[in-house]
């Protein structure tokens, strides 16, 4: 059945799954939408209460479009919507993001195999989108790109992507305010930032994540090769390799994205800085 106005209520758990026109799951039953504009978008899009679209008894393959027919632009905008809903539910009612994150990680892995140039181009160009969400997506895309170039297995890459999508859970509530902030940070803000890797790990454990690689990657993604990072001031090869990849992806994404108090850096300038200006902090073999 097509989703129409009146079927979804604001701040009430969804009574059904919502599927896109291609049959893929967009939102899971039980998710709460807190913004009316999001409901309006769902009603404007071609979305359904069953994976088979209008006909509950029709085979999905007979009516869905192929995933390859979806442009990268459409996919990024759709993914931004899904991530925003997921993280909003997490901040508002403690929604467990793990299932959504792991599914999106696999999607991103395949997108980065099938159309890496378009994906990379989009996350460079769309820095106008909601800061906390596009930065999270940038971290995942750049991490997958790096891991693929290192020849990592699919399982290892998707696990890394999951870490990239959750590394900032511990400061997610602050990210939009920090984006708009100019001038020195207050002491409590600095303390929260320095604690966020450990806070993120605690949150993931609370949501049932037991994978040590995922947790280690998140917990040490702000360590630096020269020992200047946090929280444990680890150095060199003592830093988990996944964390070293996340550190580079995060630094690169942060620097190409605009902030209230500075303009975005060009990709060339950022890479030059990573290779020269900050070469002691980041694993140069990975850079």
Task: Please report, for each region that a protein language model flagged, where it lies by residue.
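Terminal helices and disordered tails flanking the catalytic cores of nucleotide-processing hydrolases
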Residues: 1-92, 96-99, 103, 264-287
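Short clusters of hydrophobic/aromatic residues that line enzyme substrate/ligand-binding pockets
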Residues: 18, 33, 179, 185, ...
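Short, contiguous strand/loop micro-motifs
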Residues: 24-26, 130, 187, 229
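Short N-terminal micro-motifs specific to bacterial/archaeal maturation
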Residues: 29-30, 130, 184, 191, ...
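Helix-turn-helix-type domain boundary/helix-start signal
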Residues: 31-32, 150, 183, 208, ...
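Acidic/His-rich, divalent-metal-binding segments that scaffold phosphate/diphosphate chemistry
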Residues: 59-194, 199-213
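Alpha-helical scaffolding flanking metal-ion-dependent phosphate/phosphodiester catalytic sites
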Residues: 139, 162-173, 191-202, 206-287
């Amino acid at each position: 059945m097509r989703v129409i106005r009146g079927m979804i209520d604001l701040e009430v758990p969804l009574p059904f799954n919502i599927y896109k026109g291609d049959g893929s799951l967009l939102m899971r039953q039980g998710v709460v939408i807190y913004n009316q504009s999001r409901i309006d978008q769902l009603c404007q899009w071609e979305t359904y209460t069953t994976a088979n679209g209008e006909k509950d008894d029709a085979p999905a393959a007979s009516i869905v479009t192929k995933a390859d027919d979806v442009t990268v632009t459409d996919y990024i905008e759709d993914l931004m919507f899904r991530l925003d809903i997921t993280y909003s539910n997490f901040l508002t009612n403690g929604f467990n993001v793990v299932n959504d994150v792991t599914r999106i990680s696999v999607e991103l892995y395949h997108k980065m195999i099938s159309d890496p140039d378009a994906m990379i181009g989009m996350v460079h160009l769309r820095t106008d989108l909601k800061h906390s969400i596009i930065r999270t997506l940038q971290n995942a895309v750049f991490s997958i790109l790096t891991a693929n170039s290192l020849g990592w297995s699919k399982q290892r890459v998707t696990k890394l992507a999951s870490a990239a999508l959750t590394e900032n859970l511990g400061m997610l509530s602050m990210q939009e305010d920090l984006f708009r902030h100019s001038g020195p940070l207050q002491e409590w803000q600095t303390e929260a930032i320095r604690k966020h890797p450990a806070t993120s790990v605690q949150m993931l454990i609370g949501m049932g994540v037991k994978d040590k690689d995922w947790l280690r990657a998140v917990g040490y993604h702000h360590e630096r090769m020269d020992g200047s990072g946090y929280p444990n001031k680890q150095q060199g090869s003592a830093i988990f390799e996944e964390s070293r990849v996340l550190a580079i992806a995060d630094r690169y994404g942060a620097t190409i994205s605009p902030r209230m108090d500075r303009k975005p850096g060009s990709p060339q300038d950022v890479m030059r800085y990573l290779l020269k200006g900050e070469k002691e902090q980041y694993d140069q073999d990975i850079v």
